[in-house]
């Protein structure tokens, strides 16, 4: 095929379950030249008067060039092609708190923003998952008998850690000089970021987006903030979709206010976005610090539709979702909710134009570690 392009932005998404691929050859920023594109099972070959560029597909990914269909040109976006594809299955997602690794080990809790130690050398004898936050509502909706555990919170013992959807519960008595009061914020001593809150005089809740839990003999991992928040939320969504067949979520602050509506499209995508005019790999601007330099241009992704709910936007839709038992709430500090909304907006702006919106929702395409 021949098209007129200059610096061609190449975007490839492979859907593992559907065994299909979407290839987008973007429009040049300015000017243009003749460019011949050849698609082989394992690579894309682009020839121009200035030379030839080959983009190799990741190991385990193969295209079927003869299946090319749905060829169309979208103004402002470029040339779209759909092909059959094969890709190896991705590994199962790793739990946000690996129970088999952490139980029986001494761990330390760090503030993710500045590295300040919040809990030092805590030996965890039990690491247990908590029931869904919707559990009481589900019991009331589907069971003919009352919930015997209604309004009875679970409190961890000194060497316990209970894992919720977006938080950890730990016993706080042995780490504080004075007995904490219930319903007060836990603030980092160094950077003053809210890390969690006290549930009772002996239980502290830490939000997963605010703390890093490491074996005590390990060092604090310096992870860029936007990458960390994105990876935690993406991992939570993948785990909940897999375990509970839940695909709609509300992101709400600790004050109960809904900030974002999320609707998971799929988590089986393999995304590749190099730049054809050079040998180096161009990543999404937001993800440049989240992928190792030698990890290649392909990454597992979760695709999520989102709607912001700040400044009274989508108020009726948010109220409808809050009253729907199939919608799962995820609670974060209010400042992190706003931070996440900014991350989603920046990520959306980096996508090809035709992929940024679906009906009234916007698209978030996040790197998902496995």
From Swiss-Prot:
GO cellular component, as recorded: cytosol; nucleus; ubiquitin ligase complex
Pathway given in the UniProt record: Protein modification; protein ubiquitination
Modifications made to the protein after synthesis: Ubiquitinated by UBCH10 (E2 ubiquitin-conjugating enzyme).
Molecular function, one GO term: ubiquitin-like protein conjugating enzyme binding
Region feature Interaction with UBE2C, mapped onto this chain: 214-236
Region annotation (HECT-like) ranges: 332-368
Documented EC number(s): 2.3.2.26
InterPro entries recorded: UBQ-conj_enz_E2-bd_prot
Class in the EC hierarchy, top level: transferase
Binding sites annotated in the UniProt record for Zn(2+): 144
Domain statement: The C-terminal half (AA 188-389) is able to bind cyclin-B and shows a self-ubiquitination activity (mono-, poly, or multi-ubiquitination) in a HECT-like sequence dependent manner.
Assembly and interaction partners: Interacts with UBE2C/UbcH10 (E2 ubiquitin-conjugating enzyme). In vitro, interacts with cyclin-B.
PANTHER family: E3 UBIQUITIN-PROTEIN LIGASE E3D, E3 UBIQUITIN-PROTEIN LIGASE E3D FAMILY MEMBER
Protein name: E3 ubiquitin-protein ligase E3D
Annotated source species: Rattus norvegicus (Rat)
Protein encoded by which gene: Ube3d
